[in-house]
Amino acid sequence: MSEVKSRKKSGPKGAPAAEPGKRSEGGKTPVARSSGGGGWADPRTCLSLLSLGTCLGLAWFVFQQSEKFAKVENQYQLLKLETNEFQQLQSKISLISEKWQKSEAIMEQLKSFQIIAHLKRLQEEINEVKTWSNRITEKQDILNNSLTTLSQDITKVDQSTTSMAKDVGLKITSVKTDIRRISGLVTDVISLTDSVQELENKIEKVEKNTVKNIGDLLSSSIDRTATLRKTASENSQRINSVKKTLTELKSDFDKHTDRFLSLEGDRAKVLKTVTFANDLKPKVYNLKKDFSRLEPLVNDLTLRIGRLVTDLLQREKEIAFLSEKISNLTIVQAEIKDIKDEIAHISDMN
């Protein structure tokens, strides 16, 4: 550009000098014009190159700006999505807060109705009934064991009395045979026979008394065992009925708990829970009635158990009495042996 300006400035100064040349040399003017046209072509190319460079720079700048704009658009869309998600979360949080408020209101209403306290009382009463039933079963097992031991003791006593009676009978027969053999002895032998007869009469009386006592004991024990078995069967039936009622109560309680847990935070379901609680009231009243009916039954069972204990003590006393009688029989047997020894000694002396 500086060269072009210098050439433009030098152009008019050299024009008057060139006019005589033009006039003198007419053939040299086209060469000068051609040389001036080559000077003008260089700035045009420079301008075109500069315009191309600027266009390329602008294109590159526009391309970078478009990339940045695309990135900004993506970020804007991501922000839109995040704002939508944030709005959805806010709506969910608002719904959860509303449900929480409703649930708190429902819990306050339920606390006002005191259903949970009634359910806890029901559970405690059911546990008490379970403990009562377990105690009754344990007492029944104890009674059965005592009955078996009684029957075993009675059989042992019967066997011992029969064996003792057989031994006494054999000994009496042996004594009678010995007395018959020694019938020709002196008055001492007669006195001995009289004493032996008296002893035999005493033994017969003792045997009769023992047989009577054993028969009375057996009859009374049989009657008592029959009554005990009847009472035990009745108690087992009552216990089974109580167990059935307990299972029914458990099933009802499980159903009610399932219903109570399935309640949600709507007014209609709250009303259903209220009606359910109103339905539970007569059932609780019926349960209280059943428990009030069970209490006299349990008292009767305790009285019967006390009677059984007294009967067992009486039987132990009777067994002790029988053992004393058996000891007396052993003493009588020892006396009979002594008499036999004396009779044998007298026969040896004779």
From Swiss-Prot:
Keywords: Coiled coil, Endoplasmic reticulum, Glycoprotein, Membrane, Transmembrane, Transmembrane helix. One of its GO terms (cellular component) is membrane. Residues 1-11 have a biased composition (Basic residues). Its main location: endoplasmic reticulum. It is a single-pass membrane protein. One of its GO terms (biological process) is response to X-ray. It is found in: Endoplasmic reticulum membrane. N-glycosylated. Glycans are attached at residues 144, 328. Residues 184-217 form a coiled coil. Induction: By X-ray irradiation. Signal peptide: none annotated. InterPro entries: Inh_kappa-B_kinase-int. The chain crosses the membrane at residues 46-62. Residues 1-39 are annotated as: Disordered. Expressed in vein endothelial cells. Isoform 4 is expressed in lung, kidney, spleen, thymus and skeletal muscle. The keyword Signal does not apply. Target of p53/TP53 with pro-apoptotic function. Shares a common promoter with APAF1 from which the 2 genes are transcribed in opposite directions. This is Inhibitor of nuclear factor kappa-B kinase-interacting protein. It comes from Homo sapiens (Human).
